[in-house]
């Protein structure tokens, strides 16, 4: 053992290697600062401040727009270096002063009036959330403590489930539901532009776990002939806006019953459940839809790990998303894992279309 340690030390005799190794270690340790700086910029409404200032703003402009005390100006400069280095915002020299502008990423942080199609500021607040982050600091306990075996990392950290907090904390629940609406709008805008054929020939659709109906509204607007039903828990559909005449909201439990329709949509639902529960949900879906020769299918929108763009960012996003979902004992699946639960639920075939970058459309046929 001692000899092996000595050999490993000798492999790092180069000063350059040691320096590079230390830099990489620090870089990994400080990676969370990217997320917290992004969250801070989102909560400070930096994107909106730049937008209100004509699309470009100095530090002084930002401070004035967001009502920042002058003593915090130098700290704002330090904070803004993080999202500019990582490409969330752009910066250039303007007469010796830093001038910040929006990028395609920071435009997604614009709040607008709540109706902006491409807005994800609330999603950032859900993903980079102190409750969620604390859960990941409990993962080691979840792995090693026997009494934690039947709990999620979130329960280990907080003594209750994530869903209980969403249901009982009005503010947290509102942010979460708004985030799901935002994400649905962006996803459906892409799908309806790039892969609208998945909805062709459908006369009725049930969006299972469809929240406030953002996905259903997009489908009903693009395909007025499709009668859409949104199924979600009673307290969620009770708060849903009734803005579209072609959408019906039904309160219920998708483990117990799913209304009959040509097609069932499951968008970002199954990744929150383990395989046995996914099989139960899919069997309920199979009971609700038409036969395959009559156009019946289940449309799933989820990550398929290993399928999609080969660039490092989307590949890494899939892996990070998978570990992120551990906090509620969820999982992002590879194709063979999806296939296993489809067959166990009684489906005969499926088709994967990687149209959403790191996420895909999966059409599953009875």
Swiss-Prot record:
Keywords: Cytoplasm, Melatonin biosynthesis, Methyltransferase, S-adenosyl-L-methionine, Transferase. Homodimer. It is found in: Cytoplasm. The keyword Transferase applies. This is Acetylserotonin O-methyltransferase 3. The keyword Ribonucleoprotein does not apply. The gene is ASMT3. It catalyses: N-acetylserotonin + S-adenosyl-L-methionine = melatonin + S-adenosyl-L-homocysteine + H(+). Pfam families: Dimerisation, Methyltransf_2. The active site is at residues 271, 302, 332. Pathway: Aromatic compound metabolism; melatonin biosynthesis; melatonin from serotonin: step 1/2. Methyltransferase which catalyzes the transfer of a methyl group onto N-acetylserotonin, producing melatonin (N-acetyl-5-methoxytryptamine). GO terms for biological process: biosynthetic process; melatonin biosynthetic process; methylation. It comes from Oryza sativa subsp. japonica (Rice). Belongs to the class I-like SAM-binding methyltransferase superfamily. Cation-independent O-methyltransferase family. GO terms for cellular component: cytoplasm. It is an enzyme of class 2 (transferase). Its EC number is 2.1.1.4. Expressed at low levels in roots, shoots, leaves, stems and flowers. Gene3D superfamilies: Vaccinia Virus protein VP39 (3.40.50.150), Winged helix-like DNA-binding domain superfamily/Winged helix DNA-binding domain (1.10.10.10). S-adenosyl-L-homocysteine binds at residues 209, 232, 253, 267. The lineage of its organism: Eukaryota, Viridiplantae, Streptophyta, Embryophyta, Tracheophyta. GO terms for molecular function: acetylserotonin O-methyltransferase activity; O-methyltransferase activity; protein dimerization activity; S-adenosylmethionine-dependent methyltransferase activity.
């Amino acid at each position: 053992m001692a000899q092996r340690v000595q050999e490993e030390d000798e492999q790092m005799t180069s000063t350059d290697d040691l320096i590079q190794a230390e830099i990489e270690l620090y870089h990994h340790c400080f990676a969370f600062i990217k997320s917290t700086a992004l969250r801070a910029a989102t909560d400070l409404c930096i994107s909106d401040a730049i937008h209100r200032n004509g699309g470009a703003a100095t530090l002084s402009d930002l401070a004035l727009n967001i009502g920042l005390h002058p003593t915090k100006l130098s700290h704002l400069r330090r904070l803004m270096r993080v999202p500019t280095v990582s490409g969330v915002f752009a910066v250039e020299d303007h007469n010796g002063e830093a001038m910040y502008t929006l990028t395609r990423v920071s435009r997604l942080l614009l709040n607008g009036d709540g109706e902006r199609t491409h807005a994800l500021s609330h999603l950032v607040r859900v993903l980079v959330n102190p409750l969620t982050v604390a859960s990941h600091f409990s993962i080691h306990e979840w792995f090693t403590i026997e009494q934690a075996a039947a709990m999620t990392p979130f329960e280990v950290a907080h003594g209750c489930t994530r869903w209980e907090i969403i249901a009982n904390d009005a503010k947290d629940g509102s942010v979460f539901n708004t985030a799901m609406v935002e994400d649905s709008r962006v996803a459906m805008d892409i799908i309806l532009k790039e892969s609208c054929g998945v909805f062709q020939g459908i006369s009725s659709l049930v969006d299972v776990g469809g929240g406030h109906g953002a996905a259903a509204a997009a489908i009903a607007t693009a395909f007025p002939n499709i009668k859409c039903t949104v199924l979600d828990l009673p307290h969620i559909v009770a708060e849903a806006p009734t803005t579209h005449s072609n959408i019906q909201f039904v309160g219920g439990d998708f483990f117990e019953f799913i209304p009959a329709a040509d097609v069932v949509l499951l968008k970002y639902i199954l990744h929150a459940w383990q395989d046995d529960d996914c099989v139960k949900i899919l069997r309920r879906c199979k009971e609700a839809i038409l036969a395959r020769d009559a156009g019946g299918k289940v449309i799933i929108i989820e990550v398929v790990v290993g399928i999609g763009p080969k660039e490092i960012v989307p590949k890494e996003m899939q892996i990070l998303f998978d570990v992120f979902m551990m906090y509620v004992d969820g999982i992002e699946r590879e194709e063979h894992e999806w296939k296993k639960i489809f067959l166990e639920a009684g489906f005969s075939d499926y088709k994967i279309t990687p149209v959403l970058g790191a996420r895909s459309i999966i059409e599953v046929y009875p």
